Amino acid sequence: MAQALSEEEFQRMQTQLLELRTNNYQLSDELRKNGVELSSLRQKVAYLDKEFSKAQKALSKSKKAQEVEVLLSEKEMLQAKLHSQEEDFRLQNSTLMAEFSKLCSQLEQLELENRQLKEGVPGAAGPHVDGELLRLQAENTALQKNMAALQERYGKEAVRPSAVSEGQGDPPGDVLPISLSPMPLAEVELKWEMEREEKKLLWEQLQGLESSKQAETSRLQEELAKLSEKLKKKQESFCRLQTEKETLFNDSRNKIEELQQRKEADLKAQLARTQKLQQELEAANQSLAELRDQRQGERLEHAAALRALQDQVSSQSADAQEQVEGLLAENNALRTSLAALEQIQTAKTQELNMLREQNTELAAELKHRQADYEELMGQKDDLNSQLQESLRANSRLLEQLQEMGQEKEQLIQDLQEARKSAEKRKVMLDELAMETLQEKSQHKEELGAVRLRHEKEMLGVRARYERELRELHEDKKRQEEELRGQIREEKARTRELENLQHTVEELQAQVHSMDGAKGWFERRLKEAEESLLQQEQEQEETLKQCREQHAAELKGKEEELQNVRDQLQQAQEERDGHVKTISNLKQEVKDTVDGQRILEKKGSAVLKDLKRQLHLERKRADKLQERLQEILTNSKSRTGLEELVLSEMNSPSRTQTGDSSSVSSFSYREILKEKESSAIPARSLSSSPQAQPPRPAELSDEEVAELFQRLAETQQEKWMLEEKVKHLEVSSASMAEDLCRKSAIIETYVMDSRIDVSVAAGHTDRSGLGSVLRDLVKPGDENLREMNKKLQNMLEEQLTKNMHLHKDMEVLSQEIVRLSKECVGSPDPDLEPGEAN
């Protein structure tokens, strides 16, 4: 059993140790690969961060600065347009006010003329001529009536005196006083009729002037109402434009502030992320440095342990068990180191997942930034639409201003027509004055005669006429006051018109500025459209390139997937083989456990037999001593001894011991027979330590005690070996479980890893690892190439070390097998101390 332990268990331990070493090397290689992948991913993340920061800076500098400049330029252009429109409106208002002042002065002149016509001022030539004309017309009509009445009366008087002279024959001297007596009364009537006709004519003229004045004032009031309505509309449009301008300015300012706030927030977030990434990189670098130190320390420890093992194996064979224990301890340490490496690997995988998540977050943030850019473009389109609406409003204002200009031209034409009509009136008045002068020259003579009578009649009528004139003057004053109130109202309206003229000028200035801004915006729109077309072309080119790259990457990934599937199939096959070997090992362990239990039972039975034999031997020794004493006392030396030996040989206790020792399969007699038949050492340590031929009479008490002591020592060694066997079985079971778990971890890691480790048929592990490193390293990075070369050199050194270690382990295993064989063959000299000495 000891030989089975030494060969099978140590062979199995050797294979397990080799497998553990290979797994350790594979895990270290995978750790290096993970480190390389992690460094490449960190470099990629750093490169992506740099590119992202550059793109963000470029976007923020170009777009936000351009938008701010565009908004500021739009603001300046709008302000310039407003100023120009205000100036134009002021100019138009000033021109309208000048024309309105001219109209007011003309109205005042017309009112003065009307007043002079009403008052009949003699200082003015025109009104004096009009008064004379009226008076002469009235006098002419009155004289015509008087002439007709006098002719009728004269005809009657002429007929009546002729009849009287014929009938009575009186002299004509008496008739003259009768005919001339009513002459003063006729003159008075003539004057009265003249005054009445003159008043009628004056009243008709006053009514005509009042009607014309009222028509003119109503027309002016209508024009003023129209102008006021137009000015109100223009003022409302101006207020609306002002509010729109303020809203646009506020919106642009708010947008600029929001863009600045977003920019600051983005910068803070980027700084925080960069700091976090730097901290993580520092922590990862520290962990990598610690892992490297640990790996170097473990390598040194392993090398020292191997050297110590070699020294111990070469120095003493008895230290083989201690070396086995050291190997087991080293195995446990390797397990712990493997567990630590697995934990480190899980931590690295978690770090890789974190980096991937950060990469996805960065991609999502890029998408978010693109969405913000699209929103800004939409806002730009909204601003362009608002600008177009403002341009439409400006066009409407221009149309309104053109309508106002047309109305102004119509007013000017009406004023010119009024002037022409006034000039025509003046010409007619001049003609009438000439006619009146001619009539005056004709009727002067008649007036000279009639004036005397008229003056007499005027004395009586003047009082009544003065009363009527006072009434007329009072009416005229009331009308003048009314006209003055109307003039005040018209002046107030003219002031309002001046204010409206200013607003119209301002609006015209705004319209001009808006026209300029319109041209500028059209140019900017063309430039923006050209830039957008260029950007679309560039984006299409980049999209084509990205698609091509994506297709190439997809092909590469498909190849990698195929290779990984092949590797997975190979790993599955290997796993099936490992599972089979593990099941075989478990079956062997069960067999060994069962065999050990059987051996323990056999050993316990042998112990019982030996104890019983010991008890019988003690009894026999007591009997022998008694017999010896009896023989000594009876002086029977030789014959007694021979009888004692013969009696002992034929004693029932001896036969009983032989019969009892035959209970177990490995009995004392069988061992003696095997030793006598062959020189091969016994394979069981549970056999009896008595290897001498049956000469119990020659054994002393000291030899029996020594034999029992040796038996106890061999039993203790057996127990120690059983404990070691149990420990090795437990360790082999735990190692099998570790192997299953690690194979599952390796399979999951191979499934999750993205590294192309495709190994062509017939290639070695070294070429496959070189291809993996070449796939990991990009052709453009010189630093990565140097790193790749260093890793390849380190890998070659490690492989050479592994080969030497394999050779050393084989030598050690052979030495351990030899020492175990020697240890198994060592109980024979222990059982015969005389020969060994």
From Swiss-Prot:
GO terms for molecular function: guanyl-nucleotide exchange factor activity; identical protein binding; ionotropic glutamate receptor binding. One of its GO terms (biological process) is negative regulation of receptor clustering. Residues 648-666 have a biased composition (Polar residues). The record marks 594-595 as: Cleavage. It is a peripheral membrane protein. The modification Phosphoserine is found at residues 651, 662, 664-665, 684, 686-688, 826. Residues 4-158, 204-637, 697-731, 781-810 form a coiled coil. Disulfide bonds: none annotated. InterPro entries: GRIPAP1. Expressed in the central nervous system; especially in neurons. The keyword Heme does not apply. Residues 161-180, 555-577, 647-666, 677-702 are annotated as: Disordered. Proteolytically cleaved by caspase-3. A minor C-terminal proteolytic fragment of 30 kDa is produced. Proteolytic cleavage is required for JNK signaling activation. Interacts with GRIP1, GRIP2 and AMPA receptors. Interacts (via C-terminus) with MAPK8/JNK1 and with MAP3K1/MEKK1; the interaction promotes MAP3K1-mediated phosphorylation of MAPK8. Interacts (via N-terminus) with RAB4A (in GTP-bound form). Interacts (via C-terminus) with STX12. Regulates the endosomal recycling back to the neuronal plasma membrane, possibly by connecting early and late recycling endosomal domains and promoting segregation of recycling endosomes from early endosomal membranes. Involved in the localization of recycling endosomes to dendritic spines, thereby playing a role in the maintenance of dendritic spine morphology. Required for the activity-induced AMPA receptor recycling to dendrite membranes and for long-term potentiation and synaptic plasticity. PANTHER family: GRIP-1 ASSOCIATED PROTEIN 1 (PTHR18978), GRIP1-ASSOCIATED PROTEIN 1 (PTHR18978:SF1). This is GRIP1-associated protein 1. The lineage of its organism: Eukaryota, Metazoa, Chordata, Craniata, Vertebrata.
